[in-house]
Amino acid sequence: MPYLLKTEPDKYSFDDLVRDGETVWDGIANNQALMTLRQMKKGERCVIYHSNVGKAAVGTAKVVSMDASDARNPIVRIKAGKRLQRERPLAEIRAAGVFQGSVMFRQFRLSVVPLTEEQYDWLTRGKEPNARRNGPPLLSY
């Protein structure tokens, strides 16, 4: 299952993750976000979303290790992936049909949100389900 990880770019941005290569994704206080974090597994894909400043999906990451032995403080290590060729701003995400009814908008303050495969594809490649698309992918390789 893919996930959306929200971060405040003035505190820790996608560029910081790229510079560091890997980081522990921590500082989560919300119980529902912690439950979602505990479900993550090694190898799962993530989209990094800048909240507060910029408000856009900006890049990808991958879970490289997970330790949920302490239920109150799961340790998830992520590795930087690729920057999206084109950031996906909040207004565009909100307008996308693939996000209708998403927990991302029902509980906007959650910092860890599960995504469907269709949502991940839309964020990283611009693909709507069953839609034809011309042009290059949004994910730079």
Regions found by a protein language model. Give the residues of each.
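Aromatic- and Lys/Arg-enriched surface recognition patch
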Residues: 58-117
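Short, charged, solvent-exposed linker or helix-capping segments at domain edges/interfaces
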Residues: 16, 87-93, 123-126
